[in-house]
Amino acid sequence: MSDRPARVALYYATRDGQSRRIAEHLSRRLTEAGAPIPALDLAVAQPAASDLTAAAMVVLVAAVRYGRHLPEADRFLTVYRSLQSPPPLALASVNLTARKPGKATATGNVYLRKVIARHRLAPAVAVAFAGSLDYPRYGWRDRWIIRFIMLLTGGPTDPTTCIEYTSWRAVDDFAAAVGALVRRAGSP
């Protein structure tokens, strides 16, 4: 086993901040396990292909908005997919569908399945985390669109609703799975 921990590249795409919170939580857990791992915002800068190939593992936490992962996450995955020898990918989709039983897995979550298929990915680990619902924080248009989606899917529609659906235990489990993969990648 190497004394030097393998490098993990952790990126996120967020609109309302929940994916950032999840990525920062992952960063803290992975840092506690051995090496400082910053969570980098894809809206600020997209990594170069060389940044990705230098990593032992790449982690992406990507929010879904109106049925699609954010454009910066799609751009990131296009670069990742173009690599000749990409490092293992740990993928987390953040969406409100994952609040329902059976919808937090790569097979059970339609958005996660779609992004994996669209980019022809083979992630080492893939999960969906439920995000948060915060109607008062949304602008008028977003509030009405999201309320309509919630009406269709049986979710809360009261415009004063603020609910965090994220299971932090599930995020910790994902961090543990990523940490185990990184330790294996660092083995001779």
Predicted regions and their residues:
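N-terminal beta1-alpha1 ligand-phosphate binding loop
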Residues: 2-31
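FMN-binding flavodoxin-like domain, especially the glycine-rich phosphate-binding loop
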Residues: 3-5, 62-188
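The conserved SAM/SAH-binding core of class I Rossmann-like methyltransferase domains
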Residues: 11, 40, 92
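Short, surface-exposed acidic/glycine-rich loop or hinge patches that mediate macromolecular interfaces
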Residues: 13-17, 42, 63-67
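A short beta-strand-loop structural module common to alpha/beta enzyme folds
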Residues: 33-46
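A short, aliphatic-rich alpha-helical micro-motif
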Residues: 52-53, 84
